[in-house]
UniProtKB/Swiss-Prot annotation:
Known pathway: Amino-acid biosynthesis; L-histidine biosynthesis; L-histidine from 5-phospho-alpha-D-ribose 1-diphosphate: step 4/9
Name of this protein: 1-(5-phosphoribosyl)-5-[(5-phosphoribosylamino)methylideneamino] imidazole-4-carboxamide isomerase
Record keywords, A-Z: Amino-acid biosynthesis, Cytoplasm, Histidine biosynthesis, Isomerase
GO cellular component entries: cytoplasm
Length: 245
């Protein structure tokens, strides 16, 4: 039986742990001064994975908070995945060769598909594809741009090129604590035939259990952000809730 994996999220901006609402850089709340301390706390509570986002990097198109990422990867036993501003093979190799377990490529899947396909060929399962969608269409550049590419179509294309893991974010629900978009997440898993990690909108352990019901359809886990920071539930409660799901 496949386990349903939880990914506590740390979004980094100016070296701090923050949350944005629907990706709006003007709607920021700071939750901590040290990404490493936050990650250590999640690991202590039982996290097997930590999901890191370099928000400055996503906006700038280059790595910005990489020092914090590598500190976490080197000092903690939990596995680490990172997205945001990764646009070159040097970036990908730099992270993977220094302890990061998985690199998430998002905007470049639309803007530079040849690069993404080449990275999939070279690094396989160590690359995850981040598909952030607004009304079914992929958004790029830290969600500042919406493309004319449908998430399901891009997912299918990249699955054929070797993508094994997708991270699907429904922007409308992100940071809103309004419940995840289960339907679109399951649709992407079915369209690609691969595993999809759900992101955005989780507000309760019940939401996580609802997602976990679809793990046999390919929904392999969920990223949790704001719900943990606003203490809707603890990570320990969440892990216990999905253990038998």
């Amino acid at each position: 039986m496949n386990a349903f994996t939880l990914y506590p999220a740390i979004d980094m901006r100016n070296g701090k742990c923050v949350r944005l609402i629907q990706g709006d850089y003007g709607k920021e709340t700071i939750y901590g001064d040290s990404p490493l301390d936050m990650a250590a706390q999640f690991a202590q509570e039982g996290a097997e994975w930590i999901h890191l986002v370099d928000l400055d990097g996503a906006k700038a198109g280059r790595k910005v908070n990489d020092r914090h990422v590598l500190d976490i990867a080197r000092q903690l036993d939990a596995k680490v995945e990172i997205g945001g501003g990764i646009r070159s093979e040097a970036d990908v190799y730099g992270y993977l060769s220094q302890g990061v377990d998985r690199v998430i490529l998002g905007s470049s899947a639309v803007s530079d598909p040849a690069f993404v396909k080449s990275m999939l060929k070279q690094y396989g399962g160590k690359i995850a594809i981040g598909l952030d969608a607004r009304n079914g269409y992929v958004s790029t550049e830290g969600w500042l741009e919406t493309s004319s590419v449908r998430a399901a179509d891009l997912g299918r294309e990249l699955a054929a090129e070797g993508a094994e893991t997708f991270i699907f974010t429904d922007i409308a629900t992100d940071g809103m604590l309004s419940g995840p978009n289960i339907e679109s997440t399951v649709q992407l898993a079915k369209a690609t035939g691969k595993t999809v990690i759900a992101s955005g909108g989780v507000s309760s352990v019940a939401d996580l259990k609802a997602l976990a019901r679809f793990k046999d359809a390919g929904v392999s886990g969920a990223i949790i952000g704001k719900a943990l920071y606003t203490k809707q539930f603890t990570l320990a409660e969440a892990l216990s809730g999905v253990k038998d799901a």
